[in-house]
């Protein structure tokens, strides 16, 4: 039995030295010193020894157990130190390396245009108002002189949620909500910007786009005031050489109504492919606020007048930056955005 114990010790020491990880070392420890380990199996045969041999074998077994436990502890410490050294090598930071360059972002062209529009109209004394994107049929249509069955409703393919609730098709409802809140106080000078929704999707239309709406209410407000305001806006947005013209049009919520064109920013009015040879580019719709809209908003149309206008932010950005396809704005292509740093 003494020879068996000595052979076990030699074999165990070899296995301990060859254990390449803490998990493997644990397996070796269980194999030799566990409750069902090799050493335990040998010691179970001590009952067959003579009384003279038992103390000798017992002493040898305890010495071997102590030697193996010490060997396990030393190997465990060595493996832990090696593992720590490996982690240190993998995780250490070379402070002499140059830092990672953080790329500089760029403002989206739509955001640039919105900010510029805000600055222009804030400089003219306007306030900025906001309203809900999910709107009632009343505010989106009826309060704007577009009752149920009105032909003008067919001009806009609306996205309804229920029979009376829809995604707003324009930002004009904000004008109604604002007038209801402040009526009959004057003057009112506001612009409202935000997302609007229609069933359109092609190179010049999107199911979601951004609109800017303007409203002025006061005494003796005239069409001349409207033209002067829009001319001032156009010159600040597109350049001092730009001119505008008003063409008769129709909108249910204004009377009279006018489409507004600017002289072509590409050919400066001489005629080109972009303006189709006319020298003019359409940018917005406008007009004098309809008396029925005043009545439904709490104002007396015999005492006040006003004008309103609306334009698409994407349309302004396309003209300002020479972008041909509106869908580019929504493709999240950093190459396009980075051009506007």
From Swiss-Prot:
Keyword Metal-binding part of the UniProt annotation: yes
Gene Ontology cellular component annotations, sorted alphabetically: cytoplasm
Cofactor note: Binds 2 magnesium ions per tetramer.
Family annotation (PANTHER family): PHENYLALANINE--TRNA LIGASE, MITOCHONDRIAL (PTHR11538:SF41), PHENYLALANYL-TRNA SYNTHETASE (PTHR11538)
Family, as annotated: Belongs to the class-II aminoacyl-tRNA synthetase family. Phe-tRNA synthetase alpha subunit type 1 subfamily.
Catalysed reactions, semicolon-separated: tRNA(Phe) + L-phenylalanine + ATP = L-phenylalanyl-tRNA(Phe) + AMP + diphosphate + H(+)
EC number annotated for this UniProt entry: 6.1.1.20
NCBIfam families cross-referenced by the UniProt entry: pheS
Encoding gene, per UniProt annotation: pheS
Entry annotated with the keyword Cytoplasm: yes
Top-rank EC class of the record's enzyme: ligase
GO annotation, biological process: phenylalanyl-tRNA aminoacylation
UniProt organism field: Natranaerobius thermophilus (strain ATCC BAA-1301 / DSM 18059 / JW/NM-WN-LF)
Quaternary structure note: Tetramer of two alpha and two beta subunits.
Name of the protein in question: Phenylalanine--tRNA ligase alpha subunit
Residues annotated as binding Mg(2+): 255
Localisation per UniProt entry: Cytoplasm
